[in-house]
Amino acid sequence: MPKRTLEDTELNSGDNDIKISSKKSRKEKKDKKEKKSKDVEEPTTESTPIEVEVESKEARRERKRLKKEKKAQEAEKETEEEEKSGVEAIEPASDANAAADAKAAKKAEKARLKALKKEGKEEKADSTKSIETAAPASVTPQQNGTTYTEDPNLSGLPQSEIDSFLTTHFITITDPLSTSATLRPLTKFDYLPITDPAQRAPFKDFKAPTPIQAAAWPFLLAGRDVIGVAETGSGKTMAFAVPCVRYMSSLPKNQINKGPRAVVVSPTRELAMQSYEQIVKLAKASGLECVCVYGGVPKDEQIRALKTADIVVATPGRLNDLINQGCADLSKARYVVLDEADRMLDKGFEEEIRKIINTTPSLGKRQTLMFTATWPESVRELAATFMTSPVKIAIGDNPTGDLRANSRIVQKVEVVEPRDKEYRLMQLLKQYQSGSQKDDRILVFCLYKKEATRVESFIRQKGFRVAGIHGDLSQEQRTRSLEAFKSGNTPVLVATDVAARGLDIPAVKLVINCTFPLTVEDYVHRIGRTGRAGKDGLAITLFTEHDKAQSGALINVLKAANQPVPDELLKFGTTVKKKAHDAYGAFFKNVDTTKKATKITFD
């Protein structure tokens, strides 16, 4: 047998003896250990193993807490020493030193919070509570960084006088960031924080601000997002123009004339030009450049003007085209206005509006304003998407913003045969364009462009001074007609619905609906051309059997405004036809998409 095998055999033969001895030694060690632990446990018979374990955990937790507190104290002490040495070395007014101090303080505070983060459930709950309490401050709109200080004379007015002003003008202010008293309305032009006489010049012919101006100015001057719900002709243009120019004037001079810093979007060319004319009056006094961008004219001149323009007033279609071509940069436009927002959505510009706003600074870094005559669900969704805690200001006895005609307008509806409309139209023109009334402005609405052209020619043949404005005319012709009507050279204007919304035509005495519009909303917007700026107005509508589908909705508008309803109109019925969707027809249900859907489970 080889030697290696023999050695292995000898080792194997001794395995039993080694195993027995090792077992015996382990048993002896175990007995000694149990005896020792028994001796230790005997003096503390009251404590249980669970209690000992809890006490040891609490001791470890306490040690960790003390250790972290010590680290936090050391960090704070180190920060204080750095601040002290910084004060001795450099003057306190140094911006660099202030930045270093702020950074060090932030670092120390972070270390302290980290040290106290895991002390226990109670401390953790308190920390969470403090964070939740501080959250609203972090979402407070910063927008332009503008500040507003209330005039001392305004602050000194008794609250009863402010309440009386709000009640008299039916002003409803809803501020999601404040449950207490809101900013006081500027009841006088003297309360405006504007010292430049040139900027005050446009108000010299007015006694006091309109309700929408008085209520909106404080919030806009403070940099808040604002939703203004007010009837047409309430002075909304100046409501957003004054804060816009004041914000632009506060910018450093090296940022002026370097590209758009503010943008105003309007639904039609005429309304855009009208807003532009009002803003220019204020902008020129501050050395600001303003440009109006709309379709129907060459782009080259508009593109050149955009390079140095500070304020852009535009229609959504043309502005979106220029953005897509890379000719309009709105990345620095921190003041965004959507004028007549409901009208733009009605005209199908929602996609263009969203694209335009997405090219401006992000939410919270811009100030967004939305002015509208009504407050439908589509406008609410747009506001919820692009605005930060907006203040809603509603003017009038219709705070919900439902469709309602101006109560100062006398509405008369005449049911006539279709073939008799032109004859009756001529009778009305002779009645209201004679004697001392021969220069009174009369606005005649038609439904179609060809109809407007025919009616315009018919009125001109009868010897009346008349002009037309509709889609078939060039922009130059439309502008010339509108200016002639405003100046009074042609007191009669024949128009389609393109001029039915937002146009500020002063002193329109009478609106005649030669043909009823397709919707009752357009009817309200048409008659809204008269009775503006607190004045009374008259609207006469020629209603035929072809329009009977709108009779129910028209009757509701008349009743809501306490206007008489002729018996001939009631014969057509009071049923309100359901509005059909443009794409889905009558099978479309308009639902509130902001509400959470209800889950339905089927067995």
From Swiss-Prot:
UniProtKB keywords: ATP-binding, Coiled coil, Helicase, Hydrolase, Nucleotide-binding, Nucleus, Ribosome biogenesis, RNA-binding, rRNA processing
One term of GO molecular function: RNA binding
Main location, first listed in the record: nucleus
Entry-linked InterPro entries: DEAD/DEAH_box_helicase_dom, Helicase_ATP-bd, Helicase_C-like, P-loop_NTPase, RNA-helicase_DEAD-box_CS
Catalytic activities: ATP + H2O = ADP + phosphate + H(+)
EC number: 3.6.4.13
Localization per Swiss-Prot or TrEMBL: Nucleus, Nucleolus
Biased composition (Low complexity): 87-102
UniProt motif DEAD box: location: 339-342
Domain Helicase C-terminal: start-end pairs: 424-573
Residue ranges of the motif Q motif: 187-214
Region of interest (Disordered), ranges: 1-156
PROSITE patterns, A to Z: DEAD_ATP_HELICASE, HELICASE_ATP_BIND_1, HELICASE_CTER, Q_MOTIF
One of the record's GO cellular component terms: nucleolus
Free-text domain note: The Q motif is unique to and characteristic of the DEAD box family of RNA helicases and controls ATP binding and hydrolysis.
Known role: ATP-dependent RNA helicase required for 60S ribosomal subunit synthesis. Involved in efficient pre-rRNA processing, predominantly at site A3, which is necessary for the normal formation of 25S and 5.8S rRNAs.
Family: Belongs to the DEAD box helicase family. DDX5/DBP2 subfamily.
Name used for this protein in its record: ATP-dependent RNA helicase dbp3
Organism of this sequence: Botryotinia fuckeliana (strain B05.10) (Noble rot fungus)
Lineage of the organism: Eukaryota, Fungi, Dikarya, Ascomycota, Pezizomycotina
